[in-house]
């Protein structure tokens, strides 16, 4: 899912039919994943499911490293995959942010040149197409709003 998301986000002006997105996954992974950085808030391995309390405590315990990583990457997009509360308390604890909601209910805010989006985990038990289109539609709306605001 992350490779699909990357392609959809970085090519947000393009329309992607699902028949195209559900195939060629190995080539997509090779092509797209080198364009991104993934940051785990919990810095130690665990099982295939996550405990939000453990993730939160781990993020707070490693807040210096996490903040340094985020600052180093200077990301265009930061997708919080179910971890926005821990992320906010680690990276934006003493800052006011202006959360906005897309027309389809995806929360986000702008931090300088970065867009921070609160979203689901890529392995959520939801159809992959639902996750892909929910996220890429949100990015399209955000980018179109940003383009409009820049023209004013």
Identify the residue ranges that each predicted region occupies.
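C-terminal capping/extension of enzyme domains
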Residues: 53-67, 86-152
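A polyanion-binding, active-site-adjacent surface
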Residues: 1-73, 77, 83-85
């Amino acid at each position: 899912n992350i490779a699909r998301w990357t392609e959809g986000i970085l090519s947000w002006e393009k329309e992607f039919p699902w028949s195209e997105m559900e195939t060629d996954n190995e080539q997509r992974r090779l092509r797209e994943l080198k364009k991104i950085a993934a940051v785990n808030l919990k810095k130690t391995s665990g099982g295939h499911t996550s405990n939000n309390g453990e993730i939160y405590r781990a993020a707070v315990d490693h807040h210096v490293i996490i903040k340094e990583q985020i600052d180093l990457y200077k990301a265009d997009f930061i997708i919080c995959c179910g971890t926005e509360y821990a992320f906010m308390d680690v990276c934006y604890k003493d800052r006011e942010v202006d959360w906005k909601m897309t027309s389809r209910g995806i929360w986000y805010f702008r931090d300088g040149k970065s867009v921070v989006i609160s979203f689901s985990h890529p392995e959520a038990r939801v159809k992959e197409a639902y996750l892909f289109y929910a996220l890429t539609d949100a990015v399209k709306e955000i980018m179109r709003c940003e383009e409009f605001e820049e023209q004013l």
